[in-house]
Amino acid sequence: PLVSGQARTGISDTMRPGDISSLAQSSERAFRVTFGGSMPEYRDRYWRGLILDTLDDGTWRQSGYDPYQAPGRVNVDGGVGELKPGEYDVLMEPTDQRWAFALEGSVAVSNNVIKKTDNLFRFRRPADSAVRYRLALEGGDEPAAEALLPGDARRYLQLPSEGNPRARALADELRRSSDEIPAGDSSVGDIEVIRTLLTRFREQPYFYTLRPPKMPDDGIDSLLFDEKRGFCAHYAGATTFVLRSAGIPARVVVGYQGGEGGAGNEYLIVRQY
């Protein structure tokens, strides 16, 4: 176990970055991927795993998580043959969780993984041993964004009633500035809010560090206005908070980026760091 205030890189179904003052990089393998065709470009290798959409007392969690699991042990092999172009096999290390990782625009091929309505993939049972599953990338143009259901929109705007007042004021300022732009489509104002916030992170002296100061109280305010140092969880949580405060539905998507080639680029290894 790690001492208080420390953590290791990897995936969890909760996120509370304000309590972490040291993030140790783990080189343990998360999963290995073999492609039936060419390997995607690095920018296209984002492996989505789960969504955190509820903030309570500084902790991001999943809401509406499906607790159902089939009896018995996880099916460790989907029982499919040779890889076809566009398909890819994932050999995932044990996690004792039901989530599976996939690229954007994937569909299930093997019978041991299912696609949920939120475009995430799940096993029917927790992965208590290494699991191999197969997915395929859908061809054609990038799918158009779907309109949010009313329940999803409410959930992706949820915030505690109090806390982080400076971040809320920043969101109000960004919204007022965007409302000054003449446009017939309110989404243009939303895009301007997002663009301005991301420009703030790029142009002001914000830094990425694995050794941030602890920010337990109003941690998003501390990150945005005082410390300006953190790792990916800090910035993801702060961005989601500000966007929700500005009236823009947002959520934290958890996963891995990239991967390194192995055996002459015959497969891809994604590690915990």
Residue locations for each model-derived region?
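Helix-boundary/low-complexity linker signature
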Residues: 1-273
